[in-house]
Curated annotation (Swiss-Prot):
One of its GO terms (molecular function) is cytochrome-b5 reductase activity, acting on NAD(P)H. The chain crosses the membrane at residues 13-33. The modification Phosphothreonine is found at residue 166. Expressed in roots, stems, flowers and siliques. Detected in leaves. PROSITE patterns: FAD_FR. This is NADH--cytochrome b5 reductase 1. FAD binds at residues 129-144, 155-187. Reductase transferring electrons from NADH to cytochrome b5. Required for the NADH-dependent electron transfer involved in the desaturation and hydroxylation of fatty acids and in the desaturation of sterol precursors. No activity with NADPH as electron donor. Its EC number is 1.6.2.2. A motif (AKR2A-binding sequence (ABS) required for mitochondrion outer membrane targeting) lies at residues 34-40.
């Protein structure tokens, strides 16, 4: 056999092996890099501490807390619509644990944010009131029963009261920021006064950026003199007007104070929404 032919064949074999080796190495490197980029920080069994890096007072009793994750590419690892358990100290120095829903998604790498309404007698509210930049918060999770896949429903109706807006905002963001998810979102958000409305700027941003997919109707118990939203409590008529009608491909989400949740459950039942069409956070 021609010696030159054998040498050429050997070179081709070696080149093929080299290319295959490089491809495997590149694939492994990509996998490792991707895994590193998507480092999940939550532990469902054990509390982990995260450093407070920013605190922005939104009103006299509401603040946004920004917590740093271990690396700039870390993610919290929180499924859409689920929450975390936060541990702190009350005014007597006793441990207290309470659930909260971050307003950030896993697309917000390197950090997570909590918008907290602090009540005068709230035990965990005391802990957040006392928190300063540089302090750490103990967090465990994820927690919750809500599960969602893009396009699972044609539309969501959302009934939120007060700080119950946080899981709604998280779900709405996840839907609207996913270009392949065409689910429509109809939100009714109830508060006592105009100043009680949480995430107002962010919600208005969603209506501006997604006008055909996201609709919001505000309801105030004590509205200002000039007001074009709802007045009083969320009624059956408001739900009929601003939420999708009962159907197998819609779901109504509820999150608010216990009296509101109870009243909304009764309103929804009277309007023909089956238990399968509803979910309460």
């Amino acid at each position: 056999m021609d010696t030159e032919f054998l040498r050429t064949l050997d070179r081709q074999i070696l080149l093929g092996v080299f290319v295959a080796f490089v491809a495997v190495g590149a694939g492994a490197a990509y996998f490792l890099t991707s895994s590193k980029k998507r480092r999940v920080c939550l532990d469902p069994e054990n509390f982990k501490e995260f450093k407070l890096v920013k605190r922005h007072q939104l009103s006299h009793n509401v603040a946004k807390f920004v917590f740093e994750l271990p690396t700039s590419t870390s993610v919290l690892g929180l499924p859409i619509g689920q929450h975390i358990s936060c541990r702190g100290k009350d005014g007597q120095g006793e441990d207290v644990i309470k659930p909260y829903t971050p307003t950030t998604l896993d697309s917000d790498v390197g950090r997570f944010e909590l918008v907290i309404k602090m009540y005068p007698q709230g035990r965990m509210s005391h802990h957040f009131r006392e928190m300063r930049v540089g302090d750490h918060l103990a967090v465990k999770g994820p927690k919750g029963r809500f599960k969602y896949q893009p396009g699972q429903f044609r539309a969501f109706g959302m009934l939120a009261g007060g700080s119950g807006i946080t899981p709604m905002f998280q779900v709405a963001r996840a839907i609207l920021e996913n270009p392949t998810d065409k689910t429509k979102v109809h939100l009714i958000y109830a508060n006592v006064t105009y100043d009680d409305i949480l995430l107002k700027e962010e919600l208005e941003g969603l209506t501006t950026n997604y006008p055909e997919q996201f609709k919001i109707f505000y309801v105030l118990n004590q509205p200002p003199e000039v007001w074009d939203g709802g007045v009083g409590f969320v009624s059956k008529e408001m739900i009929q007007t601003h939420c999708p009608a009962p159907a197998s491909d819609i779901q109504i989400l509820r999150c608010g104070p216990p009296p509101m949740n109870k009243a909304m459950a009764a309103n929804l039942e009277a309007l023909g929404y089956s238990p399968e069409m509803q979910f309460q956070f």
